[in-house]
A protein has these predicted regions:
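Second-shell loop/turn segments in exported
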Residues: 33-37, 42, 58-73, 192-198
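Active-site recognition of the HExxH zinc-binding catalytic motif
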Residues: 45-58, 78, 82, 255, ...
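Short pre-active-site segment immediately N-terminal to the catalytic Zn-binding motif
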Residues: 31-45, 266-278
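An active-site-proximal "capping" alpha-helix that borders the catalytic cofactor pocket
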Residues: 70-88
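Bacterial N-terminal signal peptides that target proteins for export
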Residues: 2-9
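Catalytic zinc-binding patch centered on the HExxH motif and its immediate surroundings
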Residues: 222-254, 261-271
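Bacterial N-terminal signal peptides
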Residues: 10-19
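Pan-zinc metallopeptidase signature
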Residues: 114-205
Length: 278
């Protein structure tokens, strides 16, 4: 995936300069190991983004922060996901996946998110790289060329890491509530998407990370389902599954098969490794 990393940086340079690079959606029909790593990295980021929302609601009640806008919450959830997925410099798989998350945002047509509280996709890509670079500027020097020198990436990383360690993470060694995983039946031709998600281990990895690093106080479920006709085919989090007794509240992270199916069909469009490995 080394060439893809270079292409990703090149694309981000174009995006940050205002150049038009975005590609029309199409089914590439290509399903190889690199493509699956690429898609897995983006899907993993989305799942951990929703986990950020869940932890903000369950542990710190930040989803109801009076001074935060919806955009503030989305930005915080992106930063949360990046910190949780922060790869070690020598972790090739982790590096490939976090760069795939960046590249995945660079594939998104900005107009799709115009009426949503999220930052523009190229900004979300930039922010991921900024935090990764800020965690260890010497080891991630390759990202420096696409980062604005005025961006205090090291300070942003340190601030977010201190927030997560000080407010959210549990160091008691005690086990909170366990996380349930539910793979709903696929419908409408979503069998391959369901199989991909199961094989990827994204939900299981998220469950393990949540249980190991945070003390969950309420019932929590990661559910994968066919969302057509029920909800927007994306990923989302709900802390509104409220019970009469607050102790029985249920927190749910949902991953839609349709989103995964679309990503598998879109593949590495624009990031194909034309020249092979170096």
């Amino acid at each position: 995936m080394r060439n893809m990393r270079k292409l990703c940086l090149w694309a981000l340079l174009l995006a940050c300069s205002g150049a038009s690079w975005w590609i029309a959606a199409a089914d590439t029909g290509r399903r190889d190991e690199e493509t699956e790593t690429f898609v897995r990295g983006f899907v993993r980021f989305l799942a951990y983004h929703e986990a950020g929302h869940m932890l903000m609601g369950q542990i710190a009640d930040l989803n109801n922060h009076p001074d935060w806008s919806a955009a503030d919450r989305e930005d915080y959830a992106d930063k949360f996901a990046t910190i949780l997925l922060q790869p070690d410099p020598d972790d090739a798989n982790g590096m490939d996946e976090i760069v795939s998350a960046v590249a995945g945002w660079l594939q998104v047509e900005p107009s799709i998110l115009e009426d949503q509280p999220h930052a523009p996709p190229q900004q979300r890509a930039y922010d991921i790289l900024c935090l990764v670079y800020g965690s260890d500027p010497a080891s991630f020097a390759m990202f420096e060329e696409v980062l604005d020198p005025s961006s205090d990436c090291t300070g942003l990383y340190r601030e977010m890491r201190e927030d997560i360690d000080g407010v959210f993470r549990d160091f008691s060694g005690e086990m909170g509530k366990t996380v349930n995983i539910v793979y709903g039946p696929p419908s409408g031709g979503m069998e391959a998407a369901r199989s991909f998600l199961v094989d990827s281990g994204v939900a299981e990895d998220l469950k393990d990370d949540l249980e190991a690093e945070f003390y969950l106080t309420h019932r929590t479920t990661i559910q994968a389902m066919s969302c057509a006709g029920k909800a927007k085919p994306d990923t989302f989090y709900s802390d509104r599954v409220r019970a009469q007794n607050p102790d029985d509240d249920h927190f749910v992270i949902t991953l839609c098969y349709e989103m995964i199916d679309a990503r598998l069909k879109y593949g590495m469009r624009g990031f194909e490794d034309e020249g092979g490995e170096e």
